[in-house]
Amino acid sequence: MSSKLVLVLNCGSSSLKFAIIDPANGEEYLSGLAECFNLPEARIKWKMDGAKHEAALGAGAAHSEALNFIVNTILAEKPELSDQIAAIGHRIVHGGEKFTASVTINDEVIQGIKDAVPFAPLHNPAHLIGIEEAKKGFPHLADKNVAVFDTAFHQTMPEEAYLYALPYNLYKEHGIRRYGAHGTSHFFVSREAAKTLNKPVEELNVIVCHLGNGGSISAIVNGQCVDTSMGLTPLEGLVMGTRSGDIDPAIIFHLHDSLGMSVEQINKLLTKESGLLGLTEVTSDCRYIEDNYATKADAKRAMDVYCHRLAKYVGAYSALMEGRLDAIIFTGGIGENSALVREQVMKKLALLGFEYDHDRNLAARFGKSGAITTDNSRPALVIPTNEELVIAQDAARLTA
């Protein structure tokens, strides 16, 4: 065991993912999830030394109680593990324009995260609680907390990619522009792709599809992001689990004026009731859609819309590749595991020189990486993401 482990925290609005990782080799010594915050069934699950555990946190418990449990119950039973923690890495969804890379957390960084709350109203406040509680739980590491921003990797986008065609003053005065998300995943996967393709990162031109309950796609030219599908918030872009992705903005006025829906109701509809859930009217679970694609109209409808949108984005981003596309990469829970999504998308991309291989596609699932195209094809690769490792490595590097 290394003497410099990193505690990685990912505080969501109603959950907290945590892990203790050796940044040198990626080995996980502890991983877990606390969920159902502020509800009677608030609970925590964790895995340590190969064994799985679960406990109730108490009715109404939230981030504070979860971190208290991690420090005073889980780690109290394993002091030798706790003693090895040398830094704490925090996933931060939105850093606005201020943060182009990971940073050690100080008062100025805290203020920057607060300033970006309007762009991530559910996540950024939770991150701030996580930082505060981590400093309380590990007072000796108060100056060893590091923020890793989902938006940072996309800060290389040129103006023509991040500006909306709105009055320019809205950008200058209020920061209304496209920021993107999942940047840590896009960064990690593109670097892994460079190794797989045996190319220097600074010469790498790829399109990365991060497909999970949230989904985004990025165009990476010479190792840097030049465009991405998520916008001011993670609502723009692809069809997602419960998010609509791109829609005609006038639909919002129609829902308000003609159907009498309030702004709050429309927000809930677009973020929590749309996407795959809206299209199936049953579930946002891609596994249901894949299992029932051939037999149920709702599953076929959802899958077809999802893949149509994704293939369209890949086609659009191929125009940004400056004449050379090295590969397309699939990652995230759906990207890594849904052979059907990849098959449907690849079949639409034959014009770009992709030749789909059925057997390879079925083999590259459940944590396995690999090509899903023939030997003569332009490569399409499955590469499992590891955002926690990036966070751990950045935290270790910045606090060394």
Curated annotation (Swiss-Prot):
Residues that hold substrate according to the record: 91
Chief place of localization: cytoplasm
GO CC entries: cytosol
Required co-factors: Mg(2+); Mn(2+)
Localization: Cytoplasm
Gene Ontology MF, one: acetate kinase activity
Active site as annotated: 150 (proton donor/acceptor)
Residues involved in ATP binding: 17, 210-214, 285-287, 333-337
Domain of life: Bacteria
Binding locations of Mg(2+): 10, 387
Feature type site, description Transition state stabilizer: 182, 243
Reactions catalysed: acetate + ATP = acetyl phosphate + ADP
Pathway noted in the entry: Metabolic intermediate biosynthesis; acetyl-CoA biosynthesis; acetyl-CoA from acetate: step 1/2
Keywords: ATP-binding, Cytoplasm, Kinase, Magnesium, Metal-binding, Nucleotide-binding, Transferase
This enzyme's EC code(s): 2.7.2.1
Cofactor note: Mg(2+). Can also accept Mn(2+).
A single GO BP: acetate metabolic process
Pfam families in the cross-refs: Acetate_kinase
Role this protein plays: Catalyzes the formation of acetyl phosphate from acetate and ATP. Can also catalyze the reverse reaction.
Sequence similarity: Belongs to the acetokinase family.
Quaternary structure, from the entry: Homodimer.
Protein name: Acetate kinase
Originating gene: ackA
